[in-house]
């Protein structure tokens, strides 16, 4: 901003500030710059004008130019040299200008005005730039030492705020410059800068009293300290603030030769990188290098300095509570790069710690076994599965199963292999296999079904199975083998479980099988016949006792996984109803010889069911016999399918072609006459009745018309007559006046 000041020898006066783009005339009378009591001053003595040589205000090196043009009689002198009349010359700061030949001496000075704005919207910046342009100042995008003011609506801890406080520059509202412009235009005193301090809007500061005026203590706040930056982006952002405060900013590159004593030296502050910040791009090697430096600091009892503490140390003018590696971190300080650290987000064994009790993310190992092997092995790559709505028992079970090591996996595989030999030698009645619902697989995605199957297969009691092998291997042999069949085989063998489900209320044998099937369905397993033993169609007493013991063992798993598979129960119920209807229809079509065969089969091998049938009613007996016969028939069919399961193809993909264009077939109702074919497509119209359509139109006339009788206005007629007389009299007078100036008024016509 250019100012015209009176010289020291001249009479003291107020400085005259010159706005950009305005011409100031220096003269003796009716001028912007008025000089009185000097007879050598002309009325239009000289002209002063401030112009910008460039259109961009962000170029801080280019200041506006001040030019002067002499139009006087006695001349204008610049540094005691007379100017040529009618020519312009450029003035520099400090030049002495003399108007006339007497004591009208002045001095021109340029007062720097470089404004940097922070946290302003687009409209606020536009208004600010216009005011600065008229004042002859400049604007800067980033803070430099040449900046004189910082414009903010509210004080927040930013890099520009820190630099402005360190440099001792005032922080003002944008309205200050608008009021300053009005004061210059009206030639009044400029506003007080203290009344335009913005309010503090920073949660880290709170309600604490802070002095934001220029303090000398801030200029040497970081004297004797060395701030070590491990990232180039942080060094570029915060390095200038450290240097302004008298400190040293040093960028540490990866693979440097600095010793460990350098980081633990007094006055050395290692700035925290903030690995969890998504804006920073950190490679794996840099991450390891940063962790190594953090371990060095931890061994020496030091801590890294967050970015926010640099600003708080400048605001509160202390380095004891802030930017002190040996001190405790402040609880109210929030780093500039928020987010959990790596140690908080990921544990050592690789599992994810849940952030909320009802939204839990864990790594569940993929337990899909190979087709030819009955042993269950854990995959090396865990599969992430999200489980919602688990109770405390299931969470404990998840945490316990997620920490299985590879050694225990190998031992479990060996135990499973040993138990598999027992299964093949003794050939028990039923085996346990992973259960897959074909109805659910058609309606759900493959990914969700695979995650659900992995959860079911994984949470089977492996530890209990090894303990029971040592006590009684014969009883636990059914639990130790788990074979995963193809989808086609499971769809054919699955109705054996639900068919036994229906007869739970009538006979003891079906009730026992119902418990086993429910336990297996809740635990994610399905009961299917083995078919290799000769007595696979009968149920022995020892097997029933063993299954009762298994029910006690599986009770805990039922409670844990009841919430997981609650959605599958409606689907199983629907499937059981459909299969029951199909069985009833097939039974009605069977001949009487099949019914006799059914009674013969039910009479021999199951004595317990016969005793239960004798106690029930006659109608219930027939229903149970039909149900048991259908169950055994399905068991026999399943045996044949299991024998030929090795020849069946596995892992097939069902493809179905669908048309991508969906259109509705517009059906036309064609009316056909007798012998005339199709009728023509024509439309029927009907006149809509409007009000008054059936009446004659109402014609205005006759009595509807009223005669208009004009009244005579006597006053108006008298006024018109008077005006006519006045005009006639005026015409006569005009004609008489014209006759007086005629040379020959009476011209005789020949």
Curated annotation (Swiss-Prot):
SUPFAM superfamilies: BRCT domain, SMAD/FHA domain. Present at approximately equal levels in the heart at fetal day 17, at relatively constant levels at postnatal days 10, 17 and 21 and at slightly lower levels in the adult heart. Barely detectable in the brain. Not detected in kidney, very low levels in liver and skeletal muscle and moderate levels in heart, lung and brain (at protein level). Residues 446-457 have a biased composition (Polar residues). The modification Phosphothreonine is found at residue 337. Residues 221-403 are annotated as: Interaction with MTOR, MAPKAP1 and RICTOR. Residues 24-83 form the FHA domain. SMART domains: FHA (SM00240), Nbs1_C (SM01348). GO terms for biological process: blastocyst growth; DNA damage checkpoint signaling; DNA double-strand break processing; DNA strand resection involved in replication fork processing; double-strand break repair; double-strand break repair via alternative nonhomologous end joining; double-strand break repair via homologous recombination; host-mediated suppression of symbiont invasion. Residues 105-181, 224-315 form the BRCT domain. Residues 111-328 are annotated as: Mediates interaction with SP100. Keywords: Cell cycle, Chromosome, DNA damage, DNA repair, Isopeptide bond, Meiosis, Nucleus, Phosphoprotein, Telomere, Ubl conjugation. It holds the Pfam family FHA. GO terms for molecular function: chromatin-protein adaptor activity; damaged DNA binding; DNA-binding transcription factor binding; histone binding; phosphorylation-dependent protein binding; protein serine/threonine kinase activator activity. Gene3D superfamilies: 2.60.200.20, BRCT domain (3.40.50.10190), Nibrin, BRCT2 domain (3.40.50.10980). CDD domains: BRCT_nibrin (cd17741), FHA_NBN (cd22667). Component of the MRN complex, which plays a central role in double-strand break (DSB) repair, DNA recombination, maintenance of telomere integrity and meiosis. The MRN complex is involved in the repair of DNA double-strand breaks (DSBs) via homologous recombination (HR), an error-free mechanism which primarily occurs during S and G2 phases. The complex (1) mediates the end resection of damaged DNA, which generates proper single-stranded DNA, a key initial steps in HR, and is (2) required for the recruitment of other repair factors and efficient activation of ATM and ATR upon DNA damage. Component of the MRN complex composed of two heterodimers RAD50 and MRE11 associated with a single NBN. The MRN complexes dimerize on DNA to form joined MRN-MRN oligomers required for DNA double-strand break repair. The MRN complexes dimerize on DNA to form joined MRN-MRN oligomers required for DNA double-strand break repair. As part of the MRN complex, interacts with MCM9; the interaction recruits the complex to DNA repair sites. Component of the BASC complex, at least composed of BRCA1, MSH2, MSH6, MLH1, ATM, BLM, RAD50, MRE11 and NBN. PANTHER family: NIBRIN, NIBRIN-RELATED. This is Nibrin. It comes from Rattus norvegicus (Rat). The lineage of its organism: Eukaryota, Metazoa, Chordata, Craniata, Vertebrata.
């Amino acid at each position: 901003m250019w100012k015209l000041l009176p010289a020291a020898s001249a009479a003291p006066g107020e400085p005259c500030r010159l706005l950009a783009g305005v011409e100031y005339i220096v003269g003796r009378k009716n001028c912007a710059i008025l000089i009185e009591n000097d007879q050598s001053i002309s009325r239009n003595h000289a002209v002063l004008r401030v112009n910008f040589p460039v259109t961009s205000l962000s170029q801080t090196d280019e200041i506006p130019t001040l030019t002067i043009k002499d139009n006087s009689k006695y001349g204008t002198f610049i540094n005691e040299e007379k100017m040529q009349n009618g020519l312009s010359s450029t003035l520099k700061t400090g030049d002495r200008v003399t108007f006339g030949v007497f004591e009208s001496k002045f001095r021109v000075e340029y007062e720097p005005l470089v404004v940097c704005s922070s946290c302003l919207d687009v409209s606020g910046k536009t208004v600010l730039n216009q005011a600065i342009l008229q004042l002859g100042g400049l604007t800067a995008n980033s803070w430099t030492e040449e900046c004189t003011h910082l414009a903010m609506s509210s004080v927040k801890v930013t890099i520009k705020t820190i630099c402005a406080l360190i440099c001792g520059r005032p922080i003002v509202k944008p309205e200050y410059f608008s009021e300053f412009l009005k004061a210059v235009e009206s030639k009044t005193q400029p506003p007080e800068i203290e009344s335009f301090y913005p309010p503090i809007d920073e949660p880290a500061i709170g309600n604490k009293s802070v002095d934001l005026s220029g303090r000398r203590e801030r200029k040497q706040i970081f004297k004797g300290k060395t701030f070590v930056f491990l990232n180039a982006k942080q060094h570029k952002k915060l390095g200038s603030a450290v240097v302004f405060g008298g400190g040293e900013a040093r960028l540490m590159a990866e693979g440097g030769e600095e010793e460990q004593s350098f980081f633990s030296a007094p006055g050395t502050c290692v700035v925290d990188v903030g690995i969890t910040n998504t804006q920073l791009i950190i490679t794996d090697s840099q991450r390891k290098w940063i962790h190594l430096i953090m371990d060095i600091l931890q061994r020496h009892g030091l801590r890294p300095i967050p970015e926010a503490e640099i600003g708080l140390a400048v605001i509160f003018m202390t380095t004891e509570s802030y930017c002190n590696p040996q001190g405790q971190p402040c609880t109210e300080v929030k780093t500039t790069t928020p987010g959990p650290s790596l140690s908080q987000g990921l544990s050592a064994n690789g599992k994810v710690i849940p952030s909320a009790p009802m939204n839990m993310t864990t790594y569940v190992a993929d337990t899909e076994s190979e087709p030819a092997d009955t042993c269950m092995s854990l995959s090396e790559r865990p599969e992430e599965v999200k489980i919602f709505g688990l109770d405390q028992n299931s969470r404990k079970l998840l945490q316990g199963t997620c920490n299985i090591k590879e050694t225990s996996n190998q031992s479990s595989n060996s135990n499973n292999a040993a138990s598999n030999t027992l299964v093949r030698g003794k050939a028990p009645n039923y085996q346990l296999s992973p259960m897959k619902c074909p109805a659910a697989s058609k309606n759900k995605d493959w990914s969700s079904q695979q995650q659900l199957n992995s959860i079911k297969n994984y949470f089977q009691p492996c530890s209990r199975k090894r303990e029971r092998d040592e006590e009684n291997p014969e009883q636990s042999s059914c639990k130790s083998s788990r074979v995963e069949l193809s989808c086609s085989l499971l769809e054919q063998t699955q109705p054996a479980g639900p068919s036994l489900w229906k007869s739970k209320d009538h006979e003891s044998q079906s009730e026992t099988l119902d418990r086993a099937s429910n336990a297996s369905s809740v635990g994610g397993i399905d009961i299917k016949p083995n078919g290799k033993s000769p007595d696979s169609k009968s149920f022995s007493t020892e097997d029933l006792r063993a299954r009762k013991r298994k029910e006690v063992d599986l009770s805990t798993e039922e409670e844990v996984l009841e919430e997981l598979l609650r959605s599958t129960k409606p689907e199983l119920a629907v499937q059981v109803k459909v299969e029951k209807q199909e069985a009833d229809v097939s039974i009605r079509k069977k001949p009487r010889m099949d019914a006799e065969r059914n009674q013969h089969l039910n009479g021999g091998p199951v004595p317990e069911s016969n005793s239960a049938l004798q106690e029930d009613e006659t109608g219930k007996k027939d229903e149970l016999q039909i149900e048991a016969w259908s169950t055994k028939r399905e068991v026999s069919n399943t045996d044949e399918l299991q024998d030929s399961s090795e020849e069946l193809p596995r892992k097939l993909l069902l493809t179905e072609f669908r048309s991508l264009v969906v259109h509705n077939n517009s059906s036309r109702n064609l009316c056909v006459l007798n012998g005339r074919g199709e009728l023509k497509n024509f439309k029927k119209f009907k006149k809509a009745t409007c009000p008054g359509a059936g009446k004659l139109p109402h014609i205005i006339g006759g009595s509807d018309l009223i005669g208009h009788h004009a009244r005579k206005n006597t006053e108006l007629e008298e006024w018109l007559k008077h005006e006519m007389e006045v005009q006639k009299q005026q015409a006569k007078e005009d004609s008489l006046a014209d006759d007086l100036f005629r040379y020959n008024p009476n011209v005789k016509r020949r």
